[in-house]
Every structure is written in structure tokens, then in C-alpha cells.
């Protein structure tokens, strides 16, 4: 239907647990980071049809966050800074006509930020590279001081 109408907005729910990691939440984090991969692919596939696909990475008092060991969250009476409604401005924007394409927005407690994948220029060791070659340049491979936003592989 979106292809036929040449318009659409898709918003997936990711999580800080997937993007940054969270102790004891490997399975959940892996699934939520998978949403970012799905978004990256669909944002490319739908772009020519004005279909924008994005991710929201929310933080709020929910039944799931209340179930984390040591949590003192009361989902029936969340404190003002943890209320789920505080992510609403971001979701409304991502579902709007003005929505970007292929972006991740964090929303928690009235604070908003953007996450993205950054890469450095890389190191070309040639097709006969050895482990020793790699180890000799590993500092350059790991150096993110001049990293740039990546939207395509090796570009």
C-alpha cells in the first residue's frame, strides 16, 4: 500500500540496551539492535517511494524495566521523569511528513538525542594481508578520532 501511495512512515522500537548494551539483557539487546539493521535496509528500499523508516530508542517506566532485578520502578505511578508519555514528541515527529529517513532517536525523561553508526576511513592492507600486517596497523583500524557518519559501506 505504501508503494502504491508513494508515501509512508515506519517507526521501529529499538533500545539503548541494543545500541549501548545493558548488563543482563543480551537477548533483548540483540533483538533491539536487529531493529536498527532492519531500519537501515528498509530506509534504503523505501526511499525512492517516499517511505521513511526510522527507529525510536525509548526509555521509560514500563513493566519490563520494572522487572529488572534491583529496579524500584512503579509502573502504575511512574515518577515524572520516567513517564512513558515523555517519548511522544519523538514518535510523533518520526511518523510525520517531515520525518527523516534512516535515523535513530533516543527519547527518555524529556531528553532527546540521535544515535548513528560512525566509521573511520579504514586501512587497506591489500589482498595478501597477514595477521602481522593487521597487528602492525591495528591502532589505525581502531582510531575513531576522524570518524564520519556512515550511510554506505566503504564510502
Can you annotate each of these PLM segments?
Residues 48, 55-81, 120:
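A glycine/serine/threonine-rich, flexible loop-to-helix segment
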Residues 15:
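Residue(s) in the substrate-gating loop at a strand-loop-helix junction
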Residues 75-155:
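C-terminal helical subdomain
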Residues 1-4, 20, 36, 41-51, ...:
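Active-site-adjacent segment of SDR/Rossmann-fold oxidoreductases
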Residues 21-25:
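Active-site "substrate specificity/gating" loop of NAD(P)-dependent dehydrogenases
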Residues 31:
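Active-site helix of classical SDR
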Residues 11, 53-56, 102, 107:
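Hydrophobic structural elements of the Rossmann-like NAD(P)H-binding subdomain
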Residues 18-20, 62:
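Conserved catalytic-site region of short-chain dehydrogenase/reductase
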Amino acid at each position: 500500500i505504501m508503494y502504491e501511495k508513494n508515501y509512508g512512515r515506519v517507526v521501529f522500537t529499538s533500545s539503548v540496551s541494543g545500541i549501548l548494551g545493558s548488563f543482563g539483557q543480551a537477548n533483548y539487546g540483540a533483538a533491539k539492535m536487529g531493529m536498527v539493521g532492519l531500519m537501515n535496509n528498509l530506509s534504503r528500499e523505501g526511499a525512492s517511494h517516499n517511505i521513511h523508516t526510522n527507529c525510536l530508542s525509548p526509555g521509560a517506566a514500563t513493566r519490563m524495566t520494572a522487572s529488572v532485578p534491583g529496579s524500584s520502578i512503579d509502573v502504575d505511578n511512574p515518577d515524572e521523569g520516567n513517564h512513558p508519555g515523555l517519548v511522544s514528541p519523538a514518535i510523533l515527529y518520526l511518523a510525520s511528513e517531515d520525518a527523516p529517513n534512516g535515523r535513530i532517536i533516543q527519547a527518555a525523561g524529556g531528553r532527546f538525542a540521535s544515535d548513528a553508526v560512525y566509521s573511520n576511513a579504514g586501512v587497506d592492507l591489500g589482498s595478501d594481508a597477514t595477521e602481522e600486517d593487521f597487528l602492525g596497523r591495528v591502532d589505525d583500524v581502531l582510531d575513531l578520532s576522524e570518524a564520519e557518519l556512515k550511510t554506505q559501506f566503504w564510502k
